[in-house]
Amino acid sequence: SANKVDGLSYTLSSRVHNEKVVKRTESYIYYTEEGKLKKSNVYKLDAPYNVHIDTTHAQIANVEVVVEPKDNHSFYFKIENRGGSLYNFSKDSIIRNADLNLPKVARYNQWIEGKDYKLMVTKTQIPYSESKFSFRLVQLKEATGRATQNFSVTNASKIASIISVSKNAESLNEAVDLLNNSVQVLIENELSER
């Protein structure tokens, strides 16, 4: 029915629902690729590494960090502008301005911890190229806003139980991953309410 489609549309585009999707997909980490001619946003599935943060630990947000490979087991962190915001992830709030002071060299698959950060970098199957890849942590509300952009739910046919969900994003992998996880979160929520 139209009410069911309206209800699903509201749920799928709500901040609460999309915040769950963002947390599940770790979409609060933005990645960029900088080549010789341009700098572009890329999704984690298109990056040569993924960053995982400990969401129970204070983190410094809004600092761009370049990760360059050193060898198969370690990498370099390079930061041009250390000034960011100390961020409480669980409360989605900024505590104060702070500088990010990461070690110059770190190892893949190991927690890297300091007073204002706790993160891990894992290698993916995507090889490093001549491009520079960087990441930055953003606040949940910014990541949730990006997840809800260009998202639509419509009645796909006259059959009331079929809906069409679409999402445009920076990359196809981002759109597919966010859509799949959005539907999965919806299914889990529907099942838990029964």
Where would I find each of the regions flagged by the language model?
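A short, surface-exposed, charged and often Trp/Pro-enriched helix-loop connector in the C-terminal portion
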Residues: 162, 183-194
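Solvent-exposed, non-transmembrane alpha-helical starts
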Residues: 176-177
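Extracytoplasmic
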Residues: 1-158, 184
